[in-house]
């Protein structure tokens, strides 16, 4: 039998002895480090119930900071590094700061804190990208959107169990409009970095045939905007007139080729302001949680137009008048479903109009607004002579009011109903001249339609072969007639001051209600910045 040499035996004994002595110490150190990591993670996550619950249920397994998490960690850092491209607030998920934190984490306690910070960044990124960085109705009560945020547990389960890059790609908005807005954002940032669109036009208005420095400035600015080829011509010629017309069409202006006061004002708006509009539009796109491939009515309030859209294409279009830019009369942003139309409608006067407009008139003259009926709670007409209007206040007035079907009815000859808590609908109007105006904000909130009969024919054509004849027959009776739509039609009242047209070119509209300015302020406060713009 062979025995180890004495010196080898002593060395082996020493190693065995050392292992026996050090094993408890090494195990104790490992347990201590694990405890430090867990304690740090738990303490850091304590302020966020969803994150704390996730780590408790997974026995504090790492998502980002373990040696096996490299792919997931790299995918997240790469994704959140694009926050600026989306017009999102970089500080919420600062990839650079997280990278530094990872590189400088010296202790298990540091690693526990970084683990939670990366989870917070991931959840914030996922929520903001899929449902927006803002809660719109908290910022403006006129923006009524159902913001459907994905539950943190769902997001964490996906990233823990799925391919990291695929999960992060799944979060990205996919609409063509969003992609085009991102492209426009990059283009505007490049334009700003290159010096913008040059000097503003030093004139209040210009017309074909004019000459001089202001015309040169107008030409140069339109060249930089891409509406005109470079030229040394100093006069307002046909080429410049065509460029002005194209600009007007892209900005919702009366397209007459003359650079009037409104046109010059729009031309003088800088790329920085347009960039703000695009960033706000990106945020609004993130709120759009509905299928735009199905047939629907799209009313873009600042565009003063309603369209029937199907598979991304316009199949019907009409001008509209929207609510006045005063409190309680601005048209809200929301979505619902059109269920029916009413031909020869009566008009149930809204309570706000009754007490603010009609009651004061009737208190001065009981025969005022003679086209309006006073009605009781059962809908019965009340003789005016039996009512002492002066005895009532706005709060105590017990009657309603109604305008029967007539040529002068405030709702015209047809209204299109998508019942909602805002009491907003589309309707005809006897006030046709307002549709010729550039800015069409004159109603009490409802949407007046320039071509209501054509809209009715279009809607009915989906359920009958004789749409026009059937509509006219009901109209000729003079009686109030309800026609149900066999298939309800989604209606979306939206507010985009920047959006791509059918050819993909960016178009801009006035911020008629000032909502974009308010949203930009909120985004800026959250940490969104204009790239390349010095503050």
Segments (PLM) and residue ranges:
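Well-ordered beta-sheet/strand-loop patches within structured domains
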Residues: 2, 31-54, 116, 123, ...
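Bacterial N-terminal signal peptides that target proteins for export
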Residues: 2-15
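Short stretches within intrinsically disordered, low-complexity N-terminal or propeptide regions
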Residues: 7, 25-29
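Bacterial N-terminal signal peptides
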Residues: 13-24
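Cationic-aromatic interfacial patches
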Residues: 29-147
């Amino acid at each position: 039998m062979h025995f180890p040499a004495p010196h080898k035996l002593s060395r082996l004994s020493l190693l065995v002895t050392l292992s026996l002595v050090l094993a408890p110490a090494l195990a104790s150190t490992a347990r201590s480090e694990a405890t430090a990591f867990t304690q740090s993670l738990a303490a850091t996550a304590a302020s966020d119930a969803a994150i704390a619950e996730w780590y408790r249920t997974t026995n504090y397994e790492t998502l980002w900071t373990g040696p096996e998490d490299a792919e997931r960690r790299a995918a997240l850092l790469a994704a959140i590094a694009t926050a600026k491209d989306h017009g999102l607030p970089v500080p919420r998920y600062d990839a650079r700061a997280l990278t530094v934190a990872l590189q400088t984490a010296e202790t298990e306690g540091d690693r526990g804190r970084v683990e939670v910070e990366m989870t917070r960044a991931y959840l914030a990124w996922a929520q903001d990208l899929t449902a927006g960085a803002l809660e719109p109705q908290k910022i403006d009560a006129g923006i009524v959107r159902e913001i459907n945020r994905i539950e943190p547990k769902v997001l964490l389960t996906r990233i823990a169990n799925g391919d990291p890059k695929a999960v992060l790609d799944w979060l990205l908005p996919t609409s063509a409009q969003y992609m085009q807005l991102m492209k426009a954002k990059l283009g505007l940032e490049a334009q700003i970095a290159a010096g913008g669109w040059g000097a503003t036009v030093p004139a209040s208005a210009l017309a074909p045939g004019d000459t001089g420095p202001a015309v040169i400035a107008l030409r140069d600015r339109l060249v930089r905007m891409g509406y005109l080829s470079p030229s040394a011509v100093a006069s307002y010629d046909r080429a410049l007139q065509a460029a002005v017309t194209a600009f007007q069409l892209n900005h919702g202006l009366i397209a007459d080729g003359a650079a009037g006061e409104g046109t010059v004002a729009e031309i003088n708006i800088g790329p920085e302001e347009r960039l703000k509009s695009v960033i706000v539009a990106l945020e609004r796109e993130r709120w759009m949680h509905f299928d735009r491939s199905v047939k629907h009515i799209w009313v873009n309030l600042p565009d003063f137009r309603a369209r029937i859209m199907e598979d991304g294409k316009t199949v019907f279009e009409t001008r509209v008048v929207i609510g006045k830019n005063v409190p309680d009369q601005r048209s809200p942003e929301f979505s619902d479903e059109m269920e029916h139309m009413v031909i020869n409608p009566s008009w149930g006067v809204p309570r706000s109009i009754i007490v603010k407009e009609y009651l004061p008139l009737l208190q001065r003259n009981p025969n005022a607004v003679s086209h309006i009926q006073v009605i009781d709670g059962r809908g019965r007409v009340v003789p005016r002579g039996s009512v002492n209007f002066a005895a009532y206040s706005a709060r105590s007035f017990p009657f309603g009011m109604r305008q029967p079907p007539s040529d002068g009815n405030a709702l015209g000859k047809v209204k299109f109903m998508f019942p909602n808590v805002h009491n907003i609908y589309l309707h005809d109007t006897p006030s046709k001249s307002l549709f010729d105006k550039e800015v069409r904000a004159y109603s009490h909130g409802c949407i007046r339609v320039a071509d209501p009969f054509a809209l009715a024919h279009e809607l009915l054509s989906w359920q009958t072969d004789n749409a026009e004849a059937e509509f006219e027959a009901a109209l000729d009776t003079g009686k109030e007639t309800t026609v149900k739509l066999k298939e309800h039609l989604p209606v979306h009242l939206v507010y985009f001051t920047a959006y791509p047209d059918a050819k993909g070119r960016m178009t801009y509209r006035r911020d008629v209600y000032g909502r974009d300015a308010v949203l930009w302020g909120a985004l800026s406060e959250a940490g969104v910045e204009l790239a390349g713009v010095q503050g």
